[in-house]
Amino acid sequence: MVTQATSVRWQLWIVAFGFFMQTLDTTIVNTALPSIAASLGENPLRMQSVIVSYVLTVAVMLPASGWLADRIGVKWVFFSAIILFTFGSLMCAQSATLNELILSRVLQGVGGAMMVPVGRLTVMKIVPREQYMAAMAFVTLPGQIGPLVGPALGGFLVEFASWHWIFLINLPVGVIGALATLLLMPNHKMSTRRFDISGFIMLAIGMATLTLALDGHTGLGLSPLAIAGLILCGVIALGSYWWHALGNRFALFSLHLFKNKIYTLGLVGSMSARIGSGMLPFMTPIFLQIGLGFSPFHAGLMMIPMIIGSMGMKRIIVQVVNRFGYRRVLVNATLLLAVVSLSLPLVAIMGWTLLMPVVLFFQGMLNALRFSTMNTLTLKTLPDRLASSGNSLLSMAMQLSMSIGVSTAGILLGTFAHHQVATNTPATHSAFLYSYLCMAIIIALPALIFNRVPPDTGANRHLAR
């Protein structure tokens, strides 16, 4: 007979596998984009929609995931998330055109949006409060391994099999996870307040139309009139949500959040910063393969120092922020990240390839320092009654800004390369160099926002990872 302790342990393993699937997918696809483009007969500089469609879907669906779990139960929502993610992966592998792949990635994104937040909620419900931190450390460890192995695994599969296998690899894990969820996961429910369907639809339309407008010309080939229409639709939708949320206690996100100066600064700074940082995982593998002629596997291996730097930095972030304070850490880390990011193409084009892993290592360190510090700064002064709403809005904003970052990177590459590309040529080097220069400026700009953080804002609570 399975004891309660053993049952909980298996349930934690199920959540951990969900975290692994979701985080692996965020990095494994980037390395494969040039190969996918060649297979589908597309320009590799116009493949950002494959990433944007997934990340944007996650951003749109995040607000509904927690409510669905409370309403239907964590077991059935987590099971549905795994099934959707796995079926979406199968459809991605079967895609014969770019549009088919984008639609399949949307389906994947619906599952991915529910998997991680519902997994966190599951842990809260199945372990005692005093064991929550230890349980979360256990289930998030595979989530840290996913980004570490993703680029190299993606490059290996593309080079020695085909790009289809970066999606097919999810199938056995998904089937096992779905069966284990059915057999072992309890179906905890909670009483729920009324879901703000109107607000959800307004925000979804606003985010989707504005992101599509940004990606419309280079990624989707839309006319200027269509892009203007999307922008107008997005502005109207977001303005309508603001009006809808005024004095509405059932609003998806309370407008009282913006009365908190630190939260508002942190949210605006986080969104601005993640636009720049969101460009890096998309731009770097493409630069290595198209700009420098690296093989997919070699490009994937080159991404590992960035992940190692990120994981290593997380162990000392608390001490760094306690020593220097939020403002100094965020301003200096932001400016240093801009310099380090620009140095990558300079070092590579000058032939100093041995320094590239060092540059990527420091890039990962600075990114992790900014991310964790921004997350905690944003949430640290919120009262308990607004903490859940504030955290959900921050999570949604993070995903949205990363999709904007990928779209922006695609626009820059397409503009400077004039939508024509040849591997490892002076013209291609120039296109990437100008793109990285613009990206470095975008990365540096949030320092102006972070400089407005009060200097006495110190680290008096555990930093968000």
Curated annotation (Swiss-Prot):
Topology with respect to the bilayer: Multi-pass membrane protein
InterPro entries hit by this protein: EmrB-like, MFS, MFS_dom, MFS_trans_sf, Multi-R_MdtD
Alphabetized Gene3D superfamilies for the sequence: MFS general substrate transporter like domains (1.20.1250.20), Multidrug resistance protein D (1.20.1720.10)
Membrane-crossing segments per the record: 12-32, 49-69, 72-92, 102-124, 138-158, 165-185, 195-215, 219-239, 267-287, 290-310, 342-362, 393-413, 430-450
Domain of life: Bacteria
Chief subcellular location: membrane
Coiled-coil segments on the chain, per record: none
GO molecular function: transmembrane transporter activity
Keyword field: Cell inner membrane, Cell membrane, Membrane, Transmembrane, Transmembrane helix, Transport
Subcellular location: Cell inner membrane
Gene Ontology annotations for the cellular component aspect, listed alphabetically: plasma membrane
A Gene Ontology BP annotation from the UniProt entry: transmembrane transport
Family named by the database record: Belongs to the major facilitator superfamily. TCR/Tet family.
Annotated protein name in UniProt: Putative multidrug resistance protein MdtD
Gene behind this protein: mdtD
